[in-house]
Each structure stands twice: as structure tokens, then as C-alpha cells.
Regions:
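Domain-scale recognition of functional cores that engage charged ligands
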Residues: 2-313
């Protein structure tokens, strides 16, 4: 969305021009899949074909409303679902106000959520408790397992949130037995060599990035110099808003080869700065879609990074 706004402002084309349509198609497919699972494919198709009024099926979007980055993302996706599916009953609830009962997630009008989009790390949710010390996370997952509601981003997403997943992917790549040739080509090109903590002592001397496996927003990211059986700090990410970054506490780390980046000069709100670009790609299921770019004066990017529009000459 932001890329499109910037491109329109300067009268240029941009690489994400078809990606909004891709997002709408994905959201429509998800919407139909959730309701088909609830009512059965034949009944749902019949209701749509006969233009019957569908029962109230609230699709709830939720985050902590005072965390503005998450709030903006949540509102954007909720509005895009409404654009893709005008008939959808979309609602926003702050995590501060969300409750659960024996039937799922109750809403103010007496109904219950059919689907929930939550912008809150699953690795935190699973251990959270109520003020009475009841296992809120466990109860939430039990309700999900009982099909009282569907999840836009299901518990399986916790696998990708754990940074040691990259170590697993790379370890399997090294066996030369698990992936197809196209898969291996992708891993070799796009994934920096990644290692489990226990493998660090066997690595060659040199510079490595050390990351907490549950870290977020650059917190506790370091570059270390390995020399034999010892290592010393070479560079560390200092996060200004350390206490505001919500992530699971963990002492476990993983390592990646430190790859020197190209430097770029970029004009920002406070003048001209030298720094580094980070390119990202949004995935819709297994389909690559929109691309994005950030600029940071620091080699280890965090919340200080600037949004950079991508335009086509």
C-alpha cells in the first residue's frame, strides 16, 4: 500500500502493482475456506448460489491497539478483507478487551468470533495467564483445537518465528539428500549459512551473526569474532526502545555467516545518511507477492529503519 502511495505521488510505476489484487484473491480464498469448513462445501455453495443471507460469522482482527505499528497492519488487513469480501462481518477488538469462554471468543452482541487474526507472537500467547493465574494460552489453544474458531495465522506459524528453523533448513541442505535441485538452488542463493548453537565450536574462525532464537526487532543481535574455542564481541545492536519490544525470553541462540553489505547513500527526514538496505518479500501462503525495502544507518536494522519506496524507471 505504502509503495503504491509513493509511486502515485511521484507519477511512477512500482513493482507491486498487481499485488493488491493478489492479496484480495488470497483473502477471498481464505474467507471461503473458513466458511466452507464450518457449513460444509455443498451447503455453503448453495447459500451463495441462492444469495441466501449467511448467518452472522464475525471475522475478528486483534492486536494491542496502543502498539501503533501492529495496529496499522491489523487495520490494513481488516480493510482489505472487507474490500475483497464486502459481505464479511469484520470487527476489531483490542487484545486488552478480548475474552474467552466455553464457546470461544465472545463479542459484545452475544455472538462469537468465527475467525481470528491476531498480531501477537504465538510463543508468548501459549504461556500467558489470566489475572487469576489460569493458563490463558492453553485454554485459547484448546478452544482452537475444538474448532470453536479458526485462526488466520495458526499455531504452526510458531515454527517460522523461531530463528533456529533457518539452521534446520541449512543443516538439511548440507546433507544433499532432503531437497530437490530447485529447492537447493533457492537455499544457496537466498539463505545465509545458518547454524545451531551447538555447532558453533566446529565452525571456521571468522565473523558470525549471533541471534536469539526468539528475538525480534534487532534485540540482542550481535556480530562475534570467532577465534578457535573463544569468541569476542565485534558489533552489537543497541535498541533504543528495548523495553517496548515484546518477545519470548530465551538464552538460546543461533548463528549465521556475517556477509558484508553494500553501503548506500539515502536522503531521510534529517538529511543525507550512509547506510544499508534490507529487501523483503511478502508471502501469501506459498506464493511470493509484494516486495518491500528498508534503509538503516546501522548494519543490523531495527525499528529505526526507514521505509524506502521501490519504483520502476
Amino acid at each position: 500500500y505504502a509503495n503504491e502511495v509513493a509511486a502515485n505521488y511521484v507519477g511512477r510505476k512500482h513493482p507491486n502493482i498487481e499485488c493488491r489484487k493478489e492479496l484480495h484473491t488470497f483473502l477471498k480464498r481464505m474467507y471461503d475456506a473458513v466458511l466452507s469448513a464450518k457449513y460444509g462445501r455443498n451447503q455453503y455453495d448453495s447459500m451463495r448460489a441462492n444469495r441466501e443471507s449467511l448467518p452472522k460469522d464475525p471475522f475478528v482482527f486483534s492486536c494491542f491497539h496502543d502498539y501503533f505499528e501492529d495496529y496499522g497492519t491489523t487495520q490494513f488487513l481488516m480493510n482489505e478483507l472487507k474490500t475483497a469480501c464486502p459481505e464479511a462481518d469484520t470487527r476489531f477488538i483490542s487484545f486488552y478487551d478480548m475474552k474467552i469462554d466455553d464457546e470461544g471468543i465472545p463479542l459484545e452482541d452475544g455472538s462469537h468470533a468465527t475467525l481470528l487474526y491476531r498480531l501477537h507472537p504465538m510463543e508468548l500467547l501459549i504461556d500467558e495467564q489470566t489475572p487469576d493465574n489460569e493458563p490463558l494460552g492453553e485454554m485459547f489453544l484448546d478452544l482452537y483445537e475444538d474448532d470453536t474458531f479458526a485462526l488466520f495465522n495458526p499455531p504452526e506459524s510458531i515454527i517460522l518465528q523461531n530463528k533456529s528453523f533457518m539452521s534446520l533448513v541449512y543443516a538439511l541442505y548440507l546433507t544433499d539428500q532432503f531437497y530437490t535441485k530447485p529447492d537447493r538452488d533457492i537455499i544457496e542463493r537466498y539463505l545465509a549459512p545458518s547454524y545451531f548453537e551447538n555447532d558453533f565450536s566446529a565452525l571456521d574462525d571468522g565473523l558470525y551473526i549471533q541471534k536469539e532464537i526468539w528475538g525480534r526487532e534487532g534485540r540482542h543481535v550481535q556480530v562475534v569474532q570467532k577465534r578457535g574455542d573463544t569468541s569476542e564481541l565485534y558489533m552489537e545492536k543497541l535498541v533504543d526502545n528495548y523495553d517496548d519490544i515484546v518477545c519470548r525470553d530465551s538464552k538460546k541462540v543461533m548463528y549465521q555467516d556475517f556477509i558484508q553489505q553494500k553501503r548506500f547513500t539515502h536522503t531521510v527526514d534529517c538529511g543525507v545518511k550512509d547506510g544499508f538496505l534490507t529487501l523483503s518479500c511478502f508471502m501469501l501462503g506459498d506464493q511470493a507477492s509484494a516486495v518491500g525495502c528498508r534503509f538503516s544507518p546501522e548494519e543490523i536494522a531495527g525499528t529505526e529503519a526507514y521505509f524506502v519506496p521501490l519504483l520502476i524507471e
